[in-house]
């Protein structure tokens, strides 16, 4: 569908300050690397990822989403009370239910009348959310939407490192865990 009456008013991000390098992950995986005789530098070589940013421990996805949402509103001519639809479009969630959007909605200070929900579809979740919001604007259901994503990879990376260091895995056995790092 081609959208005629929809635009992106602002785009903003909120990045965590802490950097977790591939070198540090490999250092923490040294028992596994030594046991399987894996060469250092393999993680960065295979992924192209030198470093990733991680939120402090116990940071919830709604905290990251709220920070990004506040930053987007600050850069726009739209006030929080004009938002009629709020979507948290991430894989990470505060909990299964209620929607993570409900927590971020409160933290941003959006109106109680705003529709809220989560859209989780891996890397396409944000694009799906844009399409949903634009379709609702085009159809006249709403005038303004705020879409956020707040991922927190720290718990997954930490659990993966722990699993790889404690499980009795061979080179083939570690492959399913690779994308988690």
Q: Where does each model-flagged region fall?
A:
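Acyl-thioester C-C bond-transforming condensing/cleaving domain
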Residues: 2, 34, 74-80, 94-98, ...
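Short glycine-rich or small-residue beta-strand-to-loop segments that form or flank ligand, phosphate
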Residues: 84-91
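Conserved "HGTGT" condensation-loop signature of ketosynthase/thiolase-family condensing enzymes
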Residues: 1-84, 106-109, 178
């Amino acid at each position: 569908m081609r959208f005629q009456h929809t635009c992106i008013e602002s785009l903003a991000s909120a990045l965590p300050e802490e950097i977790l390098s591939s070198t540090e992950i490999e250092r923490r995986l040294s028992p596994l690397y030594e046991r399987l005789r894996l060469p250092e530098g393999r993680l960065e070589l295979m992924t192209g990822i030198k470093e990733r940013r991680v939120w402090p421990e116990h940071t919830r996805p709604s905290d990251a989403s709220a920070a990004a949402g506040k930053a987007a509103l600050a850069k726009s001519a739209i006030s929080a009370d004009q938002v009629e639809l709020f979507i948290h479009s991430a894989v990470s969630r505060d909990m299964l239910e209620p929607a993570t959007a409900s927590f971020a909605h409160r933290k941003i200070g959006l109106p109680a009348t705003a529709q809220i929900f989560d859209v989780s579809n891996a890397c396409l979740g944000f694009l799906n959310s844009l399409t949903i919001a634009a379709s609702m604007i085009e159809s006249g259901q709403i005038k303004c939407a705020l879409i956020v994503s707040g991922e927190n990879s720290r718990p997954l990376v930490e659990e993966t490192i722990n699993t790889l260091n404690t499980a009795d895995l061979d080179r083939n056995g570690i492959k399913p865990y690779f994308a988690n790092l």
